Amino acid sequence: MATEFIKSCCGGCFYGETEKHNFSVERDFKAAVPNSQNATISVPPLTSVSVKPQLGCTEDYLLSKLPSDGKEVPFVVPKFKLSYIQPRTQETPSHLEELEGSARASFGDRKVELSSSSQHGPSYDVYNPFYMYQHISPDLSRRFPPRSEVKRLYGSVCDLRTNKLPGSPGLSKSMFDLTNSSQRFIQRHDSLSSVPSSSSSRKNSQGSNRSLDTITLSGDERDFGRLNVKLFYNSSVEQIWITVLQCRDLSWPSSYGDTPTVSIKGILTLPKPVHFKSSAKEGSNAIEFMETFVFAIKLQNLQTVRLVFKIQTQTPRKKTIGECSMSLRTLSTQEMDYSLDITPPSKISVCHAELELGTCFQAVNSRIQLQILEARYLPSSSTPLTLSFFVKVGMFSSGELIYKKKTRLLKASNGRVKWGETMIFPLIQSEKEIVFLIKLYSRSSVRRKHFVGQIWISEDSNNIEAVNQWKETVINPEKVVIRWHKLNPS
């Protein structure tokens, strides 16, 4: 009985407080509503709201957020505007015309220079690396008719789009005309060593000028032809301009017929190699390409980059029939012609790596000091993983291995590795015919070491630079002789 009496008393107290609270809130709200004529929020009657008695809460939360002076609470809906979508048919955006970058200015100046002394002739678009003047699919020409009012000229790396300048029906005769090429200076380079070589007269024993192509040659004596290119470096905008002119006296297998389709593939041996390709031409004694490729490359990278050309047949089947290469460290800001000797494609991987070595004969201490300084033109990895390189050195006396040492393993950066290590090899009076065998290896984290190339340092070496370095070292004791050496694949 006592328990039920206490419950009824407590319930009456709470119920009474709740009714008083509801009555006071309803009275305040009715007094506030007439003061706001255009209230945008409608509140349902308090009788429909179930107010649960809670300890410590004196009023409803939503009602406490209403303005105390009865101001209108607006509800604003944001206005949405349609965004502008650039039409796809607009091929020359107006904002590009306002861009006067160094690359665009250089391209415009170059175009004016080429067009200043042009002659009427076939209109070759040399700035388009994939331009094909005579090889256009009939199906594409029907579906996409040519539009003469818009021309897009571009290089392979830099986007150099600009309107075609008026008055340029052909190319500059001073740059691309080969009819007077005999009167101009052409520097001929060996494709392997990139050393200028003399052009000997092609005469037989009777002194006639009969071409040696009529004589059947075999093996290494055969002439595979020459590739004529034009190069120069624009240092102001850090661009290299490569113009493939023509391929002369090219030989191909007889199974390919009399007129196979030939193209030139170029490679810049950067850490991430850059590839470009000319249009396909019909094979002949002198294949004209006349195509220019523009690439952005920093000046310091020219010391470590080689330019490799591969001559490929497209029909009757795709195959590399010749290759040639040259170093870019001697590239000039003046435009120069190069004639590269084409060699047969190697069946093994071509090694373009070079190693800088220093030698010193210390006669007082009876020892030879060998310095492994630096390597360049290193091959890049086909995977995202960076290759590391090291050098192994072996000292031989009379054909027997006496000492062997190696450098530490270092990662390549921009195709270069700098060791700067010095190795000491003691000498004994009985030791004769000293020979050093130096090998370069690469290693990745997913496979074993891989042989890159090697060089013999001795007076009997097959490398002229190695022979000269060894002779100078022996003749001049205590003198450090430093030379760059191109590594051989075997």
Swiss-Prot record:
Residues bearing Phosphothreonine are: T214, T216
Q: Does the keyword section mention Repeat? A: yes
Query: What positions does the record give for the motif labelled Nuclear localization signal?
Result: 447-449
Query: Which Pfam families does UniProt cross-reference here?
Result: C2
Q: Which coarse location class describes where this protein primarily resides?
A: nucleus
Q: Which cell locations does it reside in?
A: Nucleus
The record's GO CC annotations read: nucleus
All copies of the C2 domain together span 223-342, 344-471
Annotated region Disordered: the residues are 189-215
Listed Low complexity bias regions: 192-211
The alphabetized UniProt keywords are:
Nucleus, Phosphoprotein, Repeat
Q: What is this protein called?
A: Tandem C2 domains nuclear protein
Q: Which organism is it from?
A: Homo sapiens (Human)
